[in-house]
């Protein structure tokens, strides 16, 4: 494995690890469970995610990355150690790593990412803004002299960028993403149906029937939770329109941020490239 390059996505929702020549070798929820008494790591990734809302007082389930930045360096280090061991048995093995980070984070936050990754046996760490990584992953040719807009909806952050000639011309981010949409659905279910649901149920509903605008053919989904009035198990059938209504205010915030980034792209800049802006 010596000399192998890797790419890491330290997402608020998922941890992804790409190894050159092998492809994506890890794609799991970026969650870790810790025993409070012994400070021992109990589970990482999918196993830890399944413990959300089901653990005892002793076990704490934590997301080491929130809002696109590392919120717990110790647990992020434990997560990195866990996954890097999956691809090698040596602590000193990979000279280079590329790590995707939100475009709007501070220099201090960028340094924290570099330090966390470098502490796990990687000699050289390069950071790449999320919109650039997303564009390359989507197969966009960002070397061409026209603008391409990329919107990356993460769990904690929506990252927006306009790319041209191998650089990020204009960017912006907003702390609204999948986690906020889930919370919107949780609040909506409680407010409208007196139904208490958890994060995993909200996530499933969002993925199944969530929409930013009304669908031509309305879809339905069954929410299962607990009746707030009597504490008994309950279920309610909701439509895609209702889930869209629940998320509407947050979706509008993202749209407004996209508009502000577009407005920051000067007409002169576009004319200089003799082309139009492609979304």
Question: Residue ranges of each PLM-predicted region?
Answer:
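Nucleotide/phosphate-binding catalytic cleft detector across ATP-hydrolyzing
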Residues: 1-155, 161-271, 276-277
